[in-house]
């Protein structure tokens, strides 16, 4: 049927900031959808609050609104733009929930807006646990025995009938938020309480646990003509009980018989047809491994994380086609863009195996609860493609960047028997490595199957990998064994360890027998039809399907999996760099391994290699492509860390030279450069031992800021206030990167300022200067950034421009650089220089309209800024105010301290823009999920050093009508200042304590600056965690609290009676 011509304007709702459970896959989906709709001639309006996305680029839609995805703001956009329809199914849970809110508030009816893709009734049937259960019962499809509960009493009633364990699944939440498996009453109370709070409809499904069943997913598509097809089926290695986002996943499924596959396929198609979904849908099923019994677990009536994985695994662009189906086109009339000849209703066929492994942030959160369950904890994921399951798995392992190039983790190999058993029986993020360790110690696959319920097939494959390891060790430099190992996915680095030689020796050995990988094409049809997809993976076979073109090429290294400190901002820069390379007339080639991102959409680059970002794997691509050079500036620390090895192998690193990169990142070299350039920095030195660090700290005075070289996201960075704390830090931190010393700096508590700049070697362009609201000491990624800077004098700005220009030219930077300064009065000190793209580049690019990664790439390729049309120096400042507000995923990471410091903790960001700082901040806070109450109770419990400052904040909160609550010490200080305050008991005291007030909803904002709460037993830690668990905003920096206060003051009105007494009282504002 033809596409609809009765609609002209479509509003696409984005997914907002990156959080655990909702990451870059929705930038990929949203970008595809916007381009797909524009391709069909529709006027597209986009709303999304995340500036770090490709989808919020001005070219992606006819109108782009970077505004909060809240009922208030989206309603305003609808009333202004008057769209004929909205498409909410490509914005994750955020998009679906917003569509439901708009409908419930009557906005869609008022403005006569139609919902495309999946109608609201279908969304309700899939998302509302009770409606979903009723639908399954109607269809005669089995669901686990369950009950809908709205309070704890109903939960007790269900458990009395069924017994433990039970699974809690909150309605309308993301990534299993608030859910979990409960084995006892204490766990039930905690999980149900949390789940009901996080569910927007205060509803949970309690179901009988079927943990141990196989978990299988089907990604399905349906159009308005009721044509339905399976894009991909995937099998979780981990059985039911671990969230699919935290599971190792294989596509296509490996252990289903044809009968099982067809049975579950028919069920999935039956469900999508019953829901009348038009577009993409994900069906999750549980299969009894010992019979043909199955249960339907849940349905996502939208494009999801699994959709992105299925798209990259098959090459079938689900989001693009879902958008076309939403406007009336059918699967049998839309061509498959991969083959260009077949139509979209042909089900993809795979002649390879895909493995996905999640990436967790536990390297940053040592205190976090690492146990896996039904609530997702991974921040990102990697994908690898091979001809066998074991090859794909080993390629995925070395893509993770966790210091393992094989199924070998030191902690697992050295673990005692008790730890080994615990790690195997109670899964954590690293269970795969403990399974391998158990096999090395002689445990059988039958024993491991009994403990884990992982299918014997996967355990058998693991055991064969371990067997091959042993044969490798027993037969050093054996050519046949070497060839077998390479076919099985073993890395040169691991083989070198086995044979006690260096990696180059293994390469030479392979070269002598011409043992190199070939590249196969991902074509959706297992070579049944001719395809020209420029999408490749490596394997050790005979026929190579990737041929070098006559055009000169440039390779861009991607940034790998999303993790804290290296997020979607780097993928944004990678994509823009690719576009710039193409504009300059070169062939652009990407190497990356993240299935969620826009950069791994094969239509973005001229060629895509889906490969691990290791020296060996990257060099293989370079050898076949023979590029002009490699760009490493946009792939975060992942790419920068490869530069040295590539250069040693004769590869040309484009842009800033390796020597100059090292001058910026190596402390001693950087200090010498600053001396020559006469630019001040806080006093400090490098240290390679505990004794050396103590001597440096004694010389410059405490507090000191300590951090290792060559890290991203403040990894292992800390403010240390005493010799004892420094000793403790040094015994942990120096392990982080033993090749580089630890930096010990005097901590300057001034105002932090951040600058991104582009240099062509002679001219330096500074798009903007951003100031941080939080003073120095809070990681820049966790600080609220403001542009243009509001509190800097002209003299300070001029100094910053001068220093930035001198640093860029003095360090011979070609391309991008990011500099962080601290301003103390009128003095400016440089803290660090990063000779690469930064986290703030997308934010600055959007607001200054200078496409930084694009311009930097053109400069890297040899052009100069003036010829490109840019005037060196600071670009003219915009009139509007823009803020970048961090977003955290603390609710998903229990046991993690929420206090902010030098180590980064945020997973994403949002942008607020308006004509005043207060309005921009309001938008930023609201978009980040902070609830802005106009009245209520503020709980203040602050460190002694902050009490004086807290008095002024308390006065202002009181003036606008807030009640102040404080613990004894803080309360005494406030009483002395004549501020009305209610004193509350500390944790551990008799009667109601402050924790009770937090749990009972009597507190609307918590301000807590007790920075000694790193260990869970500390009071400060408990206060902050309870606040997060109960959805109460908590500020661990007085600067953040002051920013919230400014917003609240701007929204209040002064009230004064006409018969005011002669003794004037302070005016009350509400």
Swiss-Prot record:
Ligand binding (Mn(2+) 3): 820, 832
Superkingdom in the source lineage: Bacteria
UniProt binding sites for ATP 1: 129, 169, 175-176, 208, 210, 215, 241-243, 284, 298
EC number: 6.3.4.16, 6.3.5.5
Binding positions for Mg(2+) 3 per the UniProt entry: 820, 832
Residues engaged in binding ATP 2: 707, 746, 748, 752, 777-780, 820, 832
Ligand binding (Mg(2+) 4): 832, 834
Positions that bind Mn(2+) 2: 298, 300
Signal sequence, renumbered to the chain: none
Carboxyphosphate synthetic domain, as annotated region: 1-401
Region (Oligomerization domain): 402-546
Keywords for the protein's UniProt record, in alphabetical order: Amino-acid biosynthesis, Arginine biosynthesis, ATP-binding, Ligase, Magnesium, Manganese, Metal-binding, Nucleotide-binding, Pyrimidine biosynthesis, Repeat
GO MF: ATP binding; carbamoyl-phosphate synthase (ammonia) activity; carbamoyl-phosphate synthase (glutamine-hydrolyzing) activity; metal ion binding
Domain MGS-like, residue spans: 930-1070
Pathway: Amino-acid biosynthesis; L-arginine biosynthesis; carbamoyl phosphate from bicarbonate: step 1/1; Pyrimidine metabolism; UMP biosynthesis via de novo pathway; (S)-dihydroorotate from bicarbonate: step 1/3
Binding site for Mg(2+) 2: 298, 300
Pfam families in the record: CPSase_L_D2, CPSase_L_D3, MGS
Family per record: Belongs to the CarB family.
UniProt free text on domains: The large subunit is composed of 2 ATP-grasp domains that are involved in binding the 2 ATP molecules needed for carbamoyl phosphate synthesis. The N-terminal ATP-grasp domain (referred to as the carboxyphosphate synthetic component) catalyzes the ATP-dependent phosphorylation of hydrogencarbonate to carboxyphosphate and the subsequent nucleophilic attack by ammonia to form a carbamate intermediate.
Protein name: Carbamoyl phosphate synthase large chain
Organism: Listeria monocytogenes serotype 4b (strain F2365)
Species classification: Bacteria, Bacillati, Bacillota, Bacilli, Bacillales
């Amino acid at each position: 049927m033809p596409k609809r011509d009765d609609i002209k304007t479509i509003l696409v709702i984005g997914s907002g900031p990156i959080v655990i459970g909702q990451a870059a896959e929705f930038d990929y989906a949203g970008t595809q959808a916007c381009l797909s709709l524009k391709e069909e001639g529709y006027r597209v309006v986009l709303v999304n609050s995340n500036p770090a996305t490709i989808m919020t680029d001005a070219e992606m839609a006819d109108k782009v609104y970077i505004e909060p995805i809240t009922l208030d703001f989206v309603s305003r956009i609808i009333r202004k733009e008057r769209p004929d329809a909205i498409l909410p199914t490509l914005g994750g849970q955020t998009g679906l929930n917003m569509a439901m809110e708009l409908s419930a508030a009557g906005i869609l009816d008022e403005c006569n807006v139609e919902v495309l893709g999946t109608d609201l009734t279908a969304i309700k049937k899939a998302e509302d646990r009770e409606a979903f259960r009723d639908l399954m019962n109607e269809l005669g499809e089995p669901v686990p025995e369950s009950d809908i509960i709205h309070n704890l009493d109903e939960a007790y009633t269900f458990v009395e009938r069924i017994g433990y364990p039970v699974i809690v699944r909150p309605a309308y939440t993301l990534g299993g938020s608030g859910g979990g498996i409960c084995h006892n009453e204490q766990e039930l109370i905690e999980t149900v309480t949390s789940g009901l709070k996080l569910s927007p409809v205060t509803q949970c499904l309690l179901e009988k646990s079927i943990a141990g069943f196989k978990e299988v997913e089907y990604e399905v598509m349906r159009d308005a003509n009721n044509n339905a097809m399976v894009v991909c089926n995937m099998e979780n290695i981990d059985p039911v009980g671990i969230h699919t986002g935290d599971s190792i996943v294989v596509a296509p499924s490996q252990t289903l018989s044809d009968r099982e596959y067809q049975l579950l396929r028919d069920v999935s198609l039956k469900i999508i047809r019953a829901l009348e979904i038009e577009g993409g849908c994900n069906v999750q099923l549980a299969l009894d491994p010992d019979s043909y019994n199955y249960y339907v677990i849940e349905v996502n009536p939208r494009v999801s994380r699994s959709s992105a994985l299925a798209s990259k695994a098959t090459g079938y662009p689900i989001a693009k086609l879902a958008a076309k189906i939403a406007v009336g086109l059918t699967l049998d009339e839309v061509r498959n863009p991969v083959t260009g000849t077949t139509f979209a209703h042909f089900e993809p066929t795979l002649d390879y195996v895909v493995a996905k492994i999640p990436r967790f942030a536990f390297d940053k959160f040592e205190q976090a609860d690492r146990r896996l369950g039904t609530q997702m904890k991974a921040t990102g994921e990697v994908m690898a493609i091979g001809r066998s399951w074991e090859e794909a798995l080993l390629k995925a392992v070395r893509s993770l960047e966790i210091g393992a190039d094989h199924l070998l983790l030191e902690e697992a190999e050295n673990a005692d028997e008790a730890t080994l058993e615990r790690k195997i029986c109670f899964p954590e993020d690293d269970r795969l490595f403990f399974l391998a360790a158990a096999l090395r110690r002689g445990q059988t696959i039958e024993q491991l199957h009994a403990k884990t319920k992982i299918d014997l097939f996967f355990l058998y494959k693991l055991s064969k990998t371990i067997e091959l390891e042993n044969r490798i060790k027993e037969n050093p430099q054996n050519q046949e064994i070497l060839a077998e190992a390479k076919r099985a996915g073993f890395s040169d680095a691991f083989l070198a360890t086995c044979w006690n030689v260096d990696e180059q020796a293994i390469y030479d050995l392979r070269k002598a027998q011409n043992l190199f990988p070939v590249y196969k094409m991902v074509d959706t049809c297992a070579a049944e039809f001719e395809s020209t997809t420029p999408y490749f993976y490596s394997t050790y076979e005979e026929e190579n399907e990737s041929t070098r073109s006559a055009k000169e090429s440039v390779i861009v290294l991607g940034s790998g999996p999303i993790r804290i400190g290296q997020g979607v901002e780097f993928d944004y820069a990678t994509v823009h760099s690719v576009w710039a390379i193409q504009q300059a007339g070169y062939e652009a080639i990407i190497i990356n391994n993240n299935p969620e991102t826009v950069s791994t959409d094969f239509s973005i680059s001229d060629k895509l290699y889906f490969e691990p970002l290791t020296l060996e794997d990257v060099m293989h691509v370079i050898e076949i492509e023979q590029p002009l050079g490699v760009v490493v500036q946009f792939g975060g620390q992942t790419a920068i860390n490869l530069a040295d090895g590539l250069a040693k192998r004769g590869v040309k690193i484009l842009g800033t030279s390796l020597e100059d990169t090292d001058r910026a990142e190596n402390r001693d070299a950087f200090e010498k450069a600053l001396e020559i350039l006469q630019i001040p920095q806080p006093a400090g030195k490098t240290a390679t031992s505990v004794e050396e660090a103590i001597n440096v700290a004694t010389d410059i005075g405490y507090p000191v800021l300590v951090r290792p070289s060559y890290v991203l996201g403040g990894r292992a960075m800390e403010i240390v206030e005493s010799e004892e704390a420094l000793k403790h830090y040094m015994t942990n931190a120096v392990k982080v990167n033993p090749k580089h010393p630890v930096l010990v700096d005097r901590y300057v508590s001034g105002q932090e300022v951040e600058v991104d700049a582009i240099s062509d070697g002679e001219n330096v362009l500074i798009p903007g200067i951003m100031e941080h609201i939080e003073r120095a000491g809070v990681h820049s990624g966790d600080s609220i950034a403001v542009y243009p800077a509001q509190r800097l004098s002209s003299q300070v700005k001029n100094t910053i421009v001068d220093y930035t220009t001198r640093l860029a030219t003095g360090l011979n930077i070609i391309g991008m650089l990011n500099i962080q300064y601290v301003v103390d009065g009128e003095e400016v000190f440089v803290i660090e220089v990063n000779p690469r793209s930064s986290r703030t580049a997308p934010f600055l690019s959007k607001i200054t309209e200078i496409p930084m990664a694009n311009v930097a790439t053109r400069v890297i390729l040899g052009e100069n800024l003036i010829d490109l049309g840019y005037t060196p120096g600071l670009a003219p400042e915009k009139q509007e105010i823009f803020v970048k507000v961090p977003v955290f995923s603390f609710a998903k990471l229990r046991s993690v301290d929420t206090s902010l410091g030098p180590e980064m903790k945020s997973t994403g960001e949002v942008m607020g823009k308006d004509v005043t700082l207060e309005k921009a901040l309001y938008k930023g806070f609201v978009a980040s999920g902070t609830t802005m109450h106009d009245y209520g109770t503020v709980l203040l419990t602050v460190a002694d050093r902050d009490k004086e400052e807290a008095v002024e904040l308390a006065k202002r909160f009181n003036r606008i009508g807030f009640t102040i609550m404080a613990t004894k010490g803080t309360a005494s200080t406030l009483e002395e200042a004549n501020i009305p305050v209610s004193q509350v008991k500390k944790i551990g005291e008799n009667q109601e304590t402050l924790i009770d007030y937090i749990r009972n909803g009597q507190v609307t904002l918590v301000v807590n600056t007790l920075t000694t709460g790193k260990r869970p037993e500390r009071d400060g830690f408990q206060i902050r965690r309870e606040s997060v668990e109960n959805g109460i905003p908590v500020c661990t920096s007085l600067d953040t609290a002051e920013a919230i206060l400014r917003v609240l003051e701007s929204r209040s009105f002064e009230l004064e009676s006409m018969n005011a007494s002669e003794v004037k009282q302070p005016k009350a504002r509400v």
